Amino acid sequence: MSWDQVWIDVNVATMDPSISAPYGAITNAAIAVKDGKIAWLGPRSELPAFDVLSIPVYRGKGGWITPGLIDAHTHLVFAGNRANEFELRLKGATYEEIARAGGGIISTVNACREADEAELFDLGRQRLNALAKEGVTTVEIKSGYGLDTETELKILRVARELGQHHHVDVKTTFLGAHAVPPEFKDNSDGYVDLIINKMLPAVIAENLADAVDVFCENIAFNLEQTERVLSAAKAAGLQVKLHAEQLSNMGGSELAARLGAKSVDHIEYLDEAGVKALSESGTCAVLLPGAFYFLRETQKPPIDLLRQYGVPMVLASDFNPGSSPICSTLLMLNMGCTLFRLTPEEALAGLTLNAAKALGIEENVGSLVVGKQADFCLWDIATPAQLAYSYGVNPCKDVVKNGKLVHQ
């Protein structure tokens, strides 16, 4: 057989739902890679003969291989920090109170408007490197800290540039409807007009976004405004997604389902009607335990209902300076289990196969199947559950991206 590399002495958590074993596991396995794709995968005893002198062979020492991790919700391109707000919250101020007083997102907006692309790129690269060291091979990056055309484009350009200069694949999302900027404080409809008539066409003209998102909440945009933005995005051929039901239930999830959104994110206040709508539309539910933890929330997402209706559950870091300044997907695995009571298998699916579904890339990544992209990680663990169980010592030993060993 003519392959580019072979991995042996490994166990593989394929996350392939067609394999009935937990995690889609194949023990005592082997993987062969050719032209950036998985060319062979199965028990080591069934591996076809190959020329060991001409093909690199990597030995996993009994460790576990999983698909490369996918962080499907981040805001990692930003300047400044909001440690002062952290102190205010610890003194009793709420997220909404800080936002209504001009803090929150707006303080980061001011920092991003002042920063140039080089500064934003350097900051973003540091954060992307941190995720990559934990086995992340694909990440979604949102804008939303510009709230004017120039800065929104600047953030998206930086996100695209990060993807061009890093082995991690970057999917970009235009989130101009993240908050109402100060200059439109009493005219949110006017700002929505600006998003639809000027920002979105400019984003499309430079091919800067794969999807469009809206923060649908009382402190941001109402249902009518949300639908206007997402309908315009859909008409332009872009995927749509939604921040919804984080602080209240406004029916955003049902709107997302009706529009065929790829995902609805946060969803702490999601009700059964919303869950049913997501199930019927195939929309993913993105769980963000980092924000739940950092904001000290108490309303948990309806995990049992999501299970009951078979809604794909995604885990993501929501890395951002205000509500989840936590640049770690491995910690999300632990938090997803300890805070939301996911099983370790559900948590890992949330950072692999279901995360790929949320980004619309499940045909290429998210599980280990012959013909899919060779994105995978070797972990020094005895069982896949260990990834969610323990935190603090990074067990990621090797990362293969597009068939190339990028971290060892």
Curated annotation (Swiss-Prot):
Fe(3+) binds at residues 73, 75, 243, 318. Belongs to the metallo-dependent hydrolases superfamily. HutI family. PANTHER family: IMIDAZOLONEPROPIONASE (PTHR42752), IMIDAZOLONEPROPIONASE-RELATED (PTHR42752:SF1). Zn(2+) binds at residues 73, 75, 243, 318. GO terms for cellular component: cytoplasm. It comes from Shewanella sp. (strain MR-4). It holds the Pfam family Amidohydro_1. Keywords: Cytoplasm, Histidine metabolism, Hydrolase, Iron, Metal-binding, Zinc. Its cofactor is Zn(2+); Fe(3+). The keyword Zinc applies. This is Imidazolonepropionase.
